[in-house]
Swiss-Prot record, chains A, B, C, D:
Disulfide bonds: none annotated. It comes from the Bacteria. This is N-acetyl-gamma-glutamyl-phosphate reductase. Pathway: Amino-acid biosynthesis; L-arginine biosynthesis; N(2)-acetyl-L-ornithine from L-glutamate: step 3/4. SUPFAM superfamilies: Glyceraldehyde-3-phosphate dehydrogenase-like, C-terminal domain (SSF55347), NAD(P)-binding Rossmann-fold domains (SSF51735). The keyword NADP applies. Catalyzes the NADPH-dependent reduction of N-acetyl-5-glutamyl phosphate to yield N-acetyl-L-glutamate 5-semialdehyde. It comes from Oceanobacillus iheyensis (strain DSM 14371 / CIP 107618 / JCM 11309 / KCTC 3954 / HTE831).
Length: 346, 346, 346, 346
């Protein structure tokens, strides 16, 4: 039984980690750490955890963690995580950072996050936790940068097609749609029910920090120059769920059926990727509460475009679920351990 | 490992049973039976079950079930269930009926359901599956009538107060609020998104078949005459969740704190009942996806009324979850077996 | 053409007044006043008003208002309104206060709002703006206290029954359900989408400031002692809409049909009250965006209770619409002036 | 006062026409015709129309209409409309067809609708009712083919850019998002609340009948060859509202500010088009219940793409509102007549 701690215990990422870890057979959640609310009981904020919570949230003590804990999940905001992660560099702690701090090169991080980047030493030791694609690196790493929610859905849909030279590396459009929980727990106009309900709201057009993240990891899969993508993101009036509808120019004449076969082959060993059959496309509700990423595809012969639809639960495969999946891989456990439940439907 | 079958495999009750049984350690779901869709794969209707489903739904063969199966869940409509349940009377099958067929006396059933009632022989052998209250009878029964969703929330809130003579048995008002999944999977004006979204819709006022069910089981807890309740039900624009807000005249001068203590004491041994502390009330979201029933109370001294708020997930504690809880009790397993997960929040 | 000003221009009450006044034939909205945001353009906060807004919001200058303006709508928070309203006491300004400041007696206000009450001089000159019931007083008043949203729905349903001695004045239960816009424009956990969506949340049980308001105006309609009601309120995952489901002990043996006839007779002259026929009940969506209050009733012979269901749009009949209806009555215009549009459906 | 009739009186298009015509100063709605429900009162299906409806729906009698009526709105399904419209060819009736029957060339109609097309005589006399762009033709026509909901939003965003050679005519991607009312009044899995709530559902990918409609009217604005677009459509869990997020390769180096100026200039005379300022994008809620189309734009210099976001209420500008706007133009009235109300917000 490994001992885990969550740092940043009061956001939605942490709350979902708590739910998922509760049924993990090899991990015991030993500490929930919150700098802003230590001393408080978590179920005062989250009554759905009534009877679950037995001890108050704790302050952060790095040395104590290094001594007592095996696994640390960083569910802190960008900017905070990189400092904490650096403290574990020389320890044996397995650290999963759910923020964006360790996802980009220093220069890109500075430009898109407008914060000071993590040290090169830290970035070099960090593996990007898109489990299905980077699991060899994940197995050997102690520090994982857990992917952003849009990048998870986008990369899982695009990488197999780019690797197989099905689509061009230029002219890829990603239309992202996310539930409001993606905007976090803080109250603002952006998360106000009366503002967001019965509404579709585009946001951060052209400026979303997930753009360079998607481009960085796509570029690792084509030889030549760097890939550029266009990403728009939209708030959808639902709590959970994220979809990327993607458009990419075809490099070759291919049928939908063959594209689907390619996907199936690519993800043959991946328990959490489900490919829809021809003529069917995933809905976000098909994956709610689960770690699945469902993918559908359509070759538009009229316009020579491949249309890809990729759906995840932003809090599971897009955050806490993938974090646990990475921990499973790092520890040599089956990637499904503690994650093999069906979606909650309807 | 016990073998289970679900009969009526395509409604929401069945779908939730499938989700929950999938993580039950002692039950294997061996057969999904559907008279209307046998031969089909369930994931054609429900793509969220993709990769889970490996064999088509089957026709109903009673004798085969008796030979091969240990546990049968009846997720069929009222009217159908009682015929099937009767076939198992002399077998060793443990049968849980999720319909209303076995919940009322013959005369009440005829009046409120306007169908021919089950045989007296069947009714006599049936235990009412409100697990927390009737577990002694459930342990000894082979046939369980699983409670309706409103009765579950209402009875769990009212019974401790009636038993302890806190409230009068006359003048109880129950204001029921349910998510649209309570109206089932069939498409109609009542379940149409454009009709029900951004809407509160009262329905079946004074005529809901859950009225006699609540009255029957409340009456078993007061000596004198029969209890009468007023129940209204409202469709709420959400998928899951059910709340009963209840009003009952106080029999004695008592404080909120004492009422809360009484509840805590009454449900001391019950894993799934959580009592809110003074000044707090449950939201339906606090129990989503879980088998919990959360209860809050307030003594309104100004009007001498007890106000009780009781929240469940209508598809879990109000249907499939309680069915499995009953099976656990019938088999001597911990009632939490396969049901000990946290709510999905947010 | 009368000139109007709105004070407190950035809340939902003001925004709805702007929408409704825009099509009023006899009122010109001359000023929008905001102490916190004067100098700003309202469409920066509310882009749906783009092209409508031509001048910035202004500071409050009482004397200037008295000289230039005929009608003032106070859409300010409780506590602020009573100070401003007092300034108009000796002027010819018609002032409608949408806050709770002028609704209660001094002692009740102090107890339930926990603020210093308005002066007796102001309270004496104020008429309560439940248009259908108090129009004679409204015609003669210059200062109107516009009713709260729950009291509007509750009183319109209860008063005809109390006046006609159909129901008892004791044992009335009001189960209130409101859309999230009722919680206002400010961001908080209570208005957060992820918290409130897919959820029913009871709040302020036993402590809602609308309780004494309902009781005060009900009591004016029965000779004997004062009426006491039990009110609970619930947040429903919708933006607009409010329903009171009410339960009251019958004083006499009467049929549903006769109750409905009584309502129809009582509201014969009232353009905005629509009585549902026997067996039908209003949904909140039936009145969305309109000034209607729809009422349905059912005599529960089994329990000797009258069940009343009353639905309004909380921002229209529950706030801005009724405010304009009152202005119409005060000026001798048809009460429908500027308000005679159909509900927005679906 | 012109007399109008609606044929197909029970769908959402008709219901919205009734709401809007009710406040039109020059049009009297004289007849509501329904082949399937004639003899019934419309408020039996739609209680929000209680007190509005005074006469039952009628059967269709073409000759009677020609004699008594000036304006006919066809709110019938595709396939039915073209037969009725043909009957008015030699009459003086102004006919607006809200279905897709008259929008495409015969060959395209046959291919995409898989029905027999309208006669050439009828198609030749029909003007396409995208009011802002085709008003000269609309003024001279008696028969109008009212645009589809997605084409309205897409064309209003794309045409000014194509006409001004800002974007290429190849490689245009349109990501469409619509509220569930776009799927109509009929109950099906696609409109079931429990299926569609908390969900984003792609549908008709590559096969939507709005694809050839968009292409046909875009092609009329570029000299050379025909334009091809990629369109995907998604059901969003909201009742009303439609957004097209569009991506098009830039033909020239241009700044966002200049693009916005071009839009403003193009729509200078158009009362219902509102262009967002730089850095802001429309939400569907900004136009709910109104005839506005709000447009925002962003030049993505990184990828040399123009991103356009265009939002309408699918039932107003996307159907009934635009139909009335066309009637206004045909009769020489101000296009805003009866449509100049503000959006319903929040």
């Amino acid at each position: 039984m490994k001992k885990a701690a969550i740092i940043g215990g009061t956001g939605y990422g942490a709350i979902e980690l708590i739910r998922l870890l509760d049924s993990h057979p090899y991990i015991e959640l030993a500490k929930i750490i919150s700098q802003s609310q230590h001393g408080e009981l978590l179920d005062e904020t989250y009554p759905h955890l009534a009877t679950y919570v037995t001890q108050p949230m704790q302050e952060l003590h790095i040395q104590q963690l290094i001594e007592e804990i095996d696994i640390v999940f960083l569910a802190t905001p960008a900017g905070v995580a990189k400092e904490i992660a650096a403290s574990f560099l020389d320890s044996s702690i397995q650290c999963i950072d759910l923020s964006g701090d360790l996802r980009l090169s220093s220069s890109d991080y500075e430009m898109w996050y407008q914060k000071k980047p993590a040290s090169e030493a830290l970035l070099e030791k960090t593996a990007y936790g898109l489990t299905e694609v980077f699991q060899e690196k994940i197995k050997q790493a102690n520090i994982i940068s857990n992917p952003g929610c849009f990048p998870t859905a986008a990369l899982l849909g695009l990488i197999p097609m780019l690797e197989n030279n099905i689509i061009e590396s230029k002219g890829i459009m990603i239309d992202g749609k996310t539930g409001i929980s993606g905007a976090g727990k803080n109250s603002s106009a952006k998360t106000h029910f009366s503002t967001t309900n019965e509404n579709v709201t585009p946001y951060k057009i052209g400026t979303h920090q997930h753009i360079p993240e998607i481009e960085k990891y796509l570029s690792q899969h084509v030889e030549e120059s760097s890939v550029r993508v266009t990403l728009t993101t939209h708030l959808i009036p639902m709590t959970r769920g994220l979809m990327c509808t993607m458009y990419a120019p075809l490099q070759q004449d291919i049928d939908t059926a063959d594209v689907i076969d390619l996907y199936k082959h690519y993800y043959e060993q991946s328990s959490f990727i489900r490919i829809r059959k021809q003529g069917e496309y995933p809905s976000t509700k098909d994956v709610t509460g689960s770690n699945y990423c469902d993918i559908g595809a359509y070759v538009d012969k009229r316009t020579n475009q491949l249309i890809i639809s990729s759906a995840i639960d932003n809090l599971v495969k897009g955050a806490a679920g993938q974090a646990i999946q990475n921990i499973n891989v790092m520890n040599g456990w089956d990637e499904k351990t503690g994650l093999s439940f069906l979606p909650v439907y309807p």
